[in-house]
Amino acid sequence: MYKPVDPKVDFAKQEEDVLKFWEKNDVFKKSVSSRDGRDNYIFFDGPPFATGLPHFGHFVPGTIKDIIPRYKTMKGFRVERRFGWDCHGLPVENLIEKELGLNSKTDIEKYGIDKFNEACRASVLRYVKEWKQTITRLGRWVDFENDYKTMEPAFMESIWWVMKSLWEKGLLYEGYYILPYCPRCSTVLSNHELNLGGYKDVHDPAITVRFKTLSPVKTSPAGKAFEGKNALPSDTYLLAWTTTPWTLPSNLGLAVGADIDYALIEYDGAHYIMAVPRLEAYFAKSGKEEAKEYKLIWTKKGAELEGLRYEPLFPYFKNLAADENGKNAEAGQGAFRVLIGDFVTTEDGTGIVHTAPGFGEDDNRIFKDTGVPTVCPVDAECKFTHEVSDYQGLFVKDADKQIMERLKTEGKLFKKAQILHSYPHCWRCSSPLIYRAVASWFVSVTKIKDKLLNANSKINWQPDHIKTGRFGKWLEGARDWAISRNRYWGNPIPIWKCPDCGETICVGSREELKELSGVFPEDMHKHFVDKISIPCKKCGGTMKRVSEVLDCWFESGSMPYAQQHYPFENKEHFEKNFPADFISEGLDQTRGWFYTLTILAAALFDEPAFKNCIVNGLVLAEDGKKMSKSLRNYTDPNEVIKQFGADALRLFLMNSNVVKADDLKYSDEGVRDVLKGILIPFWNSYSFYITYANIDGVKPPHNAKVDGKDEGVEEFLAKLNNPLDLWILSVTEKLVADVTEALDKYDLSQAIPPMVEYIDLLNNWYIRRSRRRFWKSENDGDKSQAYETLYRALKKFSLVAAPVVPFITESIWQNLRTESDALSIHLADYPDYNEKIRNSELEFKMKTVQKAVSMGRALRYQFNLKIRQPLKAVEIVTLNPEEKRVLLEMEESIIEELNVKEVIFHEKEDELVEYSAKANFKVLGKELGPLMKKAAAIIEQMNSSEIQNIMEGATLSIDIEGKSVEITADKIVINRIEKASLKIVNEGTLTVGLNTELTEELLMEGYIRDLVRGIQTLRKECGLDVTDRIKLYLSASQKNADNKELEKAFELFKDYVCDETLTVQSSWLKTGELTKLGSIKTSLVEAGDYEWEIGIEKNN
């Protein structure tokens, strides 16, 4: 006896039982240890921060990262699944700042870096318990006991080794560049981090400013263009546009495009220079404003404006101005002049760009080699310094309003507007970023770009477009990586500098630091190692560590080495098992973890860090917006699991485009649909087997061990004679082949759909068409073969699906397994494909008949002809002889499935329909041009016979104004007009028609089918076993009191009703009499325009 199965299973509760089983039996540990001595399969798990709770963004990659290791384990590999925690960086620091009421770096330093860092250490793992609970409940197996933490000394020491290796390869340097900078966090961010925080639409001022011209530099192009009589009028202004008024006090130049046309115009009593293509935008009629009249004086190329000087807007850096000779004692070629910039466009603004080399990458670049210093008069919190005395201590963005008011007062503001544009924000605190000049340590990524591209060429990406698309393009444009952060809680950059002679060294280990300083650092964090100094060998001075800590992305990118404490330990093991076989994360990590892993692996080993990568998309709320706790636009995923179970959620996520790096709009309804449409049917198939096997005393076949190599399958196949059995076993084997191929390619988008399709075939074709074989009372060979076939199918499908839906498959396995089977389905071997089980001919036959049936059902649905209503006939035409052979052979199946009385085959489709045709304008239009209309009129006059001939490959010649045109099937669009009482549908070579004429007898049989369905439903509601016999009471309801049609129908089909419902005694009552029978369970059953009232009781 099998353990009885409740068809109304509570999946969530059942999953809790499975979790207890796994824990009690140490199944996860056994899944690893049982593969000792086998080949290792290496999986890297990217470390999350434990300062926040897991969310849907973690559930998708988490499920993927469970499926592949489970599959590879079942395929015989030893798969360690070591979890890790990202412990350093801004996420932790921001959290502690809020908790301690600290608002700036100054506050932190007053509080004490040592106390601040220790507070970070104490809180960094605060949600570990919740993470473990959530990950475990999702069904994901990971090794928490052997986890790695980026704050542990061994991990941190390996990072120092990585730094020292880059140093020795000449790939580390210190530079002063324009970088994205967070004023709130007071630190630089790397370019790849911009995409993590995202760009948000913000409103900013957009102002046009007047810069009064001076005489040009004499030797410049402008000096030649504007000399003598060509000199500019004294009231000439350059018009420049900016969305960052706060950078104007630091303006040192104006940029123009060399090949852009610029105009001098006279307007409102003054002269202005701006780009010709932008004149319309500034002076044309706009809204209620009238057009502004101006006079065009001349146009010149931007190249001729180079060297034109102008008055500084503000006095702060006027000492840097160029003289007429293009020189300045303090600033080389001098500032406050027009330069050529290849970044200038005429898409917006005036075509003249204000440049502040301390606050713009392009601005900085065009001043390179001019000798003009990079002016950046702001402090660590982006407040103006004493250099900009009028705004000293004011946050730069807060100065916008005051600066604009001043410009207006001084007559320098030409136009003021507002712009909505996309602007980068900090990925941790969501503050708008500032681009500013800042000193930083860099990895010279541009030096190794070829290595990066070569590494990428060796990676199998899923989806594959990531290789040459998002990731490949990002690598092609890769820039040097700013790895230093002006923060506190992180891995200190292991570089010591001598303030006296500038000598600089990089330390690669704690032991090396001890040799150099005499101190061995037990703790490697900033507040410890900053106290360690090194005697300078060059000058005898004292070397101090540089103040910055490392970007936490550098740490996660080093995890392959640091989790092993490489090269200080596990050297041989690491080198034997690198690169990793598999990683997976979301699409955003193409600019994050995937990128940093690739940089460091290519730099250190000339290899990729991983061989295969599945990239998932973003999970959005149902309304398409980002999931937000504040908006409450999604259900807590833990609540989803409580309601539907983890398997349903996993399958919903994996059977979507999110596994193809596309976005997914999450909905509870979608998970519910997976439960109802896939998991419950799967459970019903299993429940059906168990229920009837127990009734008949059937035990698991002794030789049906189906994991790995099938046992006894060929002997069993030789005995089978029912095509349905041979077919479902063949389809099961096809499933093994398809899913194995997809998973071996890491293509989940091709692995999950075949499983979903299989459940439908098993439940709605094999079991439904085999039910009577299980129901019959005699235990003959056919019945036992049906049992063993279904057993093998259920067991093998469970093995195939186990990595995806680990809970339901474990529950089923525990009831189906024999003593020779593995303790857990996840300790079993994945099924090997057995070609001998495949029967392609039989698969073709079933697919053909299923296609015809599906088309017939579609017609029923389209025309509201419910399946329980018998129809006179299905009429079929096929132009494919093989299809016709199969359909003739499977005629009985078609009759049963479509609930028709007969199948009528026709030779030609015109026996079912009349044809009309229209011209295919797409095809004929190109050929006929102006003659098209006349051709269309002729085509519309074609008769049905002519159209039929064309469909069969003939050509019809028509004459249009003396021109002969050959009409073939591709040149016409065919419309089918059904003959009386027929509803038809066509797919390629197959046409299916339903005869919808309903006779009185067909209608009565339809009523009876509805009745049987109603009785079966009532049996379930009464909790009757499938073998229980019943007494049946029935009458017409009050809706159609004492209706003779229903009584007549029942008498006509009484034997059928009793056989189908196990009725041993039936009584026809007058309307209303059922209510007098007391405690009998009753129900109303609709039947066409009529309604039955029925009651049943168990026959004791």
Swiss-Prot record:
Protein's UniProt name: Isoleucine--tRNA ligase
Binding site for ATP: K629
Domain notes: IleRS has two distinct active sites: one for aminoacylation and one for editing. The misactivated valine is translocated from the active site to the editing site, which sterically excludes the correctly activated isoleucine. The single editing site contains two valyl binding pockets, one specific for each substrate (Val-AMP or Val-tRNA(Ile)).
Reaction it catalyzes: tRNA(Ile) + L-isoleucine + ATP = L-isoleucyl-tRNA(Ile) + AMP + diphosphate
Species, as recorded: Treponema denticola (strain ATCC 35405 / DSM 14222 / CIP 103919 / JCM 8153 / KCTC 15104)
Gene that this polypeptide is encoded by: ileS
UniProt function note: Catalyzes the attachment of isoleucine to tRNA(Ile). As IleRS can inadvertently accommodate and process structurally similar amino acids such as valine, to avoid such errors it has two additional distinct tRNA(Ile)-dependent editing activities. One activity is designated as 'pretransfer' editing and involves the hydrolysis of activated Val-AMP. The other activity is designated 'posttransfer' editing and involves deacylation of mischarged Val-tRNA(Ile).
Leader peptide range in chain numbering: none
EC number, as in UniProt: 6.1.1.5
GO BP, sorted A to Z: isoleucyl-tRNA aminoacylation
InterPro entries: aa-tRNA-synth_Ia (IPR002300), Anticodon_Ile_ABEc (IPR033709), Ile-tRNA-ligase (IPR002301), Ile-tRNA-ligase_type2 (IPR023586), M/V/L/I-tRNA-synth_anticd-bd (IPR013155), Rossmann-like_a/b/a_fold (IPR014729), tRNAsynth_Ia_anticodon-bd (IPR009080), Val/Leu/Ile-tRNA-synth_edit (IPR009008)
